[in-house]
Amino acid sequence: MKGKITLFFTALCFGLTGCIAPPKGLEKERFSINSYREISPQDLTCHCKTVRLGGKIVNTTVLANQTKIEVLSLPVSSISAKPFVELQSDGRFIVYFNGFVEPENLKERYITVGGQLAGTEKGKIEQADYTYPVVQADKYRIWTLSTTYDYPTDDWDEDDDWGFFRWRHRLWYVQPEIHYYLN
């Protein structure tokens, strides 16, 4: 009986771990660079490093045989490969996909990209000149931003009025806690 319980909990742990596994092909171990901050000038010139980067899609341009995406870089989770939505951006980078990717499907979405670092590209962010690292993508995963609202629990024993006259005592609106997550 004890062996069955141990087996059950072991299977449960593996099952729960599978829920947070990165998408196939975007595992951290497959890439030599896993953060925008890890990119050095030598990496940009050698064209030999594999990278896994992520962030918010800012702009999409469809070219003749490929699609160009400008991404606002965000740190990526080492476990699930999802970009951290609430952290500050590291910079921007450009991703090239072979073939056509519908630009409307990418608006206001987040992405994790795995591919080859392919040098730099000059561009502008409004009036400022900017040098973008360029990634030729092999694998990618598009994420959708979802929102949850957590309202504080209401303590019924607070005033012993069972909530009937609570509106007299509470003249303000209780703000919910807003949580953002990617799925």
Curated annotation (Swiss-Prot):
GO terms for cellular component: outer membrane. Coiled coil: none annotated. The keyword Transmembrane applies. The chain crosses the membrane at residues 7-23. InterPro entries: OMP_Slp. PROSITE patterns: PROKAR_LIPOPROTEIN. The keyword rRNA processing does not apply. Keywords: Membrane, Transmembrane, Transmembrane helix. This is Uncharacterized protein HI_0389. It comes from Haemophilus influenzae (strain ATCC 51907 / DSM 11121 / KW20 / Rd).
